[in-house]
Design a protein with these regions (language model features):
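Small-residue-rich helix-loop
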Residues: 89-163
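Short beta-strand/loop motif that positions the catalytic acidic residue
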Residues: 186-189
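Short secondary-structure boundary/capping segments
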Residues: 1, 201-205, 235-239
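Catalytic histidine-centered segment of alpha/beta-hydrolase-like enzymes
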Residues: 224-235
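Acidic catalytic loop of the alpha/beta-hydrolase fold
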Residues: 192-196
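Active-site nucleophile elbow and catalytic-triad environment of alpha/beta-hydrolase enzymes
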Residues: 161-176
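Alpha/beta-hydrolase
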Residues: 1-111
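Short alpha-helix in the alpha/beta-hydrolase fold that links the catalytic acid
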Residues: 63, 183, 197-207
Length: 249
């Protein structure tokens, strides 16, 4: 959006931001209100330089910004909100009276831009190629009615009483790799995905303390796309080549 990183390669900028997030920013946040005023001010200045929100905005929030606040406020002066599945997409802001947090979280410009295309293409495939005649209305997603009540409880391997609402499958991956050390794992992701951010995946995997032999079984590919790599044509070609190479190995 022309707010930060001008003149710097996007991958290089992403790497710089990731290093900041795992270093200076993490240390500052860990200190809580014990951080010195000078360090808090410097942290806000550096964070602003990376994410584009004003320094004063960050200081008021103690340098902590929720995703939905970021999406809502980054381009507020232009009357726009950012996407969640792909931050490159924008659309005009909701009215100030539309304050429901869950509603806004589901209002994703990236999804709105792509879903109608999927809907038309999928309906055409069902009827034209498969000869399927179904209900006139085919709903691509009913998350707000069904998914929100899904039972996410998961027993994490090696833990007692782990019936938590937000399951962590990283331990399952670690167990699978340790039990089958010849298994290969390919992890793909996009820079503009804030639904399942690339940095979060790297950080989670780093907490498994896998031996080097198992780490070498993991292949990483980061692309210039959002959550749905197949909607970005350059990424689609790159991902196909990377997956063909992975399967050959």
């Amino acid at each position: 959006f022309g707010l930060v990183g001008q003149g710097v390669d996007e991958d290089e900028w992403f790497d710089r931001a990731s290093a900041f997030a795992g270093g200076e920013y993490a240390r500052g946040i860990f200190l809580g209100d014990e951080i010195t005023p000078a360090d808090k001010d410097a942290l806000a200045e550096h964070l602003s330089a990376f994410i584009g929100l004003p320094k004063d905005y960050l200081l008021v929030r103690n340098n902590r910004v929720e995703l939905e606040d970021f999406r809502r406020d980054l381009l507020a002066s232009r009357g726009l909100v950012c996407g969640r599945l792909d931050q490159r997409f924008t659309e005009t802001s909701l009215l100030p009276s539309q304050r429901a947090s869950f509603y806004f979280a589901c209002e994703d410009p990236a999804n709105h831009a792509l879903e109608s295309c999927w809907y038309v293409a999928f309906r055409d495939f069902l009827r034209g190629d498969l000869g399927y005649e179904g209900p006139e209305e085919y709903r691509l997603s009913v998350w707000g009615e069904i998914g929100i009540g899904w039972n996410w409880v998961h027993d994490e391997p090696g833990f007692d009483e782990t019936t938590v609402a937000a399951p962590n499958l990283a331990y399952d991956i670690a167990v699978a790799l340790r039990r089958s050390p010849t298994t290969k794992l390919c992890i793909l992701g996009g820079r503009y995905d804030t639904a399942t951010p690339w940095w979060n995946v790297r950080h989670t995997m780093s907490q498994l303390y896998l031996p080097d032999a198992l780490k070498r079984q993991i292949t990483w590919h980061r692309y210039g796309c959002g959550h749905m790599a197949y909607t970005d044509e350059p990424t689609l070609h790159a991902m196909a080549a990377d997956l063909h190479e992975f399967y050959r190995e």
